[in-house]
A protein has these predicted regions:
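Conserved HGGG/HGGXW glycine-rich cap/lid loop of the alpha/beta-hydrolase fold
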Residues: 28-77
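Gly/Ala-rich beta-loop-alpha elbow adjacent to hydrolase catalytic centers
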Residues: 109, 113
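Alpha/beta-hydrolase fold catalytic core
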Residues: 1-40, 62-65, 102
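Active-site loop/oxyanion-hole signature of alpha/beta-hydrolase fold enzymes
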Residues: 72-108
């Protein structure tokens, strides 16, 4: 029996990946587009991960944005943690934002994001 692989047309894995230390919890961060372009953050919803943006982020990157997303703690390639709370999620988001720059940047989210 052959295995059929179905891909979303236009989907593209990130151009760069890295990790941010959130007080001992490793947060996986993904970027599409030019590193010197204006940043735009994408926040995924609950029970999801940043890979959900593999179809949408490249379109934004092709439009001139540096698209940055991250796997929330306990999701995707980010570490699991002893603490899960809205406060922890917000601290993690702020650490990711600080790792990108200190200028105001748009954030797009869905569901919990």
């Amino acid at each position: 029996m052959s295995e059929e692989v179905i891909r979303f047309p236009g989907a593209r894995r990130p151009d760069r990946t890295r990790r941010v230390d959130a007080y001992g919890v490793g947060i996986a961060v993904y970027e599409w587009g030019a590193p010197d372009a204006r940043p735009l953050l994408l926040a995924h919803g609950g029970f999801d991960f940043a890979g959900t943006f593999d179809g949408f982020a490249p379109l934004l990157a092709d439009g001139g944005w540096r698209v940055v997303s991250w796997d929330h703690r306990g999701h995707g390639d980010s570490d699991h943690a002893a603490l899960y709370s809205w406060q922890a999620d917000l601290r993690d988001a702020l650490l990711v934002m600080d790792s990108v720059g200190h200028e105001p940047m748009p954030i797009v989210g869905h569901s919990k994001g």
